[in-house]
Amino acid sequence: MIYPTQYDVIVIGGGHAGTEACLAAARMGCKTLLLTHNIETLGQMSCNPAIGGIGKSHLVKEIDALGGAMALATDKGGIQFRILNSRKGPAVRATRAQADRALYKAAVREILENQPNLDIFQQAADDLVVEGERVTGVTTQMGVTFKAPTVVLTAGTFLGGKIHIGMENHSGGRAGDPPSIALASRLRELPLRVDRLKTGTPPRIDARSVNFDGLEKQWGEEKTPVMSYMGSLADHPEQTCCWITHTNAQTHDFIRSGFDRSPMFTGVIEGVGPRYCPSIEDKVNRFADKDSHQIFIEPEGLKTHELYPNGISTSLPFDVQMAFVRSIKGFENAHITRPGYAIEYDFFDPRDLKYSFETKHIEGLFFAGQINGTTGYEEAGAQGLLAGLNAALKAQGKEAWCPRRDEAYIGVLADDLISMGTREPYRMFTSRAEYRLLLREDNADMRLTEKGRELGLVDDARWQAFCKKREAIELETQRMRTTWIQPNSAEANALAAKMPAELAREYSLLDLLKRPELTYDDLGSLKGEAVSDPQVAEQVEINTKYAGYINRQTDDIERMRQHENTVIPVEFDYMSVEGLSNELKQKLSEARPETLSRASRIPGVTPAAVSLILIYLKKRGLLKNKAALA
């Protein structure tokens, strides 16, 4: 049957990508349907119970700045918050939250169920309705067809999913959930490049069987941060600690003894695993000279005894898992509640996508999350939001939008995937961003919330809070610029102990704030009243101390933007460009970059090659300055 309601956007999958996608489309006023195989697993954390980390928290903050749910749910479910790289510069500082799985999932579901314009339906999607070269709907397992001009597919690890524990394997989307076999087969019929990837998870351990005596405790920050710009400490549940232990030589011997029954080493698993989150057997094999590897013991929640031993992801046989786990300090009598496993799944080459995350070959079909070759909740959520908002824009007949690399980590993520593709699960790092001093986690709202409001993603409450904060930053900066400290004054004497020399002349508070030895806390209330909002104070301090570097990066960006919007026609013949190597001709013909700027980021494409293409475009009268993402 055909369902009577006509939707604008249909989202398949209720994980981290799917939830952000459907919420974004609904916030923008589109009639949206979320199809999930099980409503009880909406927002489920399939692997580690944590949100954020280096590079990842930047994505979470950007999702939040655009009105998304991930940061809000993290504040509701976070049971430990830490600031990583706290002693380094603001560009690489990152917030990481340990989360209670149940509380996080409940927070996501509450947001979904209270979102206007959003319907949820429990049923697996088996087929896409494609008419000509455009998608027009989705057919479910029981034969119900839902119609919509745009569909966002966020299938996670479910497409052709296969779970491995030792030499045993079975079909599954994750432990306890069936895979999407029919939909995977249907997608393989489409003109899209497909391959296999692999990820894994560690065995879970009953805390009652662990000896915590002698294990190092790891507590959160004394001044607990919030993840969302709209969050507050009052949102946080009870805070708890984690622990640290290590593998040892005996652990490694047990692991090596299972190599002959490892699906990874025997060739049973064909998919490539994540480079930056390797299994314990991979670490022992690759780093044979290391005597031990660190393990973070993380609680799964406040009302469960299960622990997540971060660092020992494995697909070794269960008897080997038991042996090596019990060789680890604190785990001598450990009871494993769930075995570790690896899962292989289909992913599709992201180079077959536009920057809106719409497929190049099937109009109206968008991909987001692990289907695009990424790993991580945060990467999935960022893609989901971008795909969802662009599906909504397409349904509304509007031009697509994608932030540039100098505007957001979401833009870096999209550009990396679509211009270069990936052969292994892609994760975000701050090192991937050329302009990371501008793309800090602390200023994501200053960078993106205004655009989010323009797109219809940001509600009145968030917009008012943003405007109030922005005005407060401007006012406090101006106050400090016009407040002066005289030499030998009481204020100058109060600073003397922190300065290498006495003031020789009059200085404004803003000038003094530029000095590395002084902070906003030292100066804010020195003369007048300091701001009470720590986020405002942080922005004033960072913008002042790093002004020179920020201005330099801004100038670099302006130079790069000269060719940012120089369009390369879709039918452009690279083979005709004299001077380009055959290798570059082949790469460019395959990648089909939409602009000169994006062509320049393809590996091997030099500035000289970009110049040759530009000259060719000028000679043929093909120069255009508006990049059409839609």
Curated annotation (Swiss-Prot):
**In which residues is NAD(+) bound?**
273-287
Q: What Gene Ontology terms for biological process does this UniProt record contain?
A: tRNA methylation; tRNA wobble uridine modification
In Gene Ontology terms, what is one molecular function of this protein? flavin adenine dinucleotide binding
A single Pfam family, by name?
Answer: GIDA_C_1st
- Localization: Cytoplasm
Keyword entries, A-Z = Cytoplasm, FAD, Flavoprotein, NAD, tRNA processing
State whether keyword Flavoprotein applies.
Answer: yes
Give a yes or no for keyword Transmembrane in this entry. no
Cofactor(s) essential for the protein: FAD
Residues bound to FAD: 13-18
Q: Name one GO cellular component term.
A: cytosol
InterPro entries, per this entry? FAD/NAD-bd_sf, GIDA_C_N, MnmG, MnmG-rel, MnmG-rel_CS, MnmG_C, MnmG_C_subdom, MnmG_C_subdom_sf
Which family does this protein fall into? Answer: Belongs to the MnmG family.
* Description of how the protein assembles with itself and partners: Homodimer. Heterotetramer of two MnmE and two MnmG subunits.
Instruction: Outline what the protein does.
Output: NAD-binding protein involved in the addition of a carboxymethylaminomethyl (cmnm) group at the wobble position (U34) of certain tRNAs, forming tRNA-cmnm(5)s(2)U34.
Q: What is this protein called?
A: tRNA uridine 5-carboxymethylaminomethyl modification enzyme MnmG
Q: Native species of this protein?
A: Saccharophagus degradans (strain 2-40 / ATCC 43961 / DSM 17024)
This chain is encoded by the gene named: mnmG
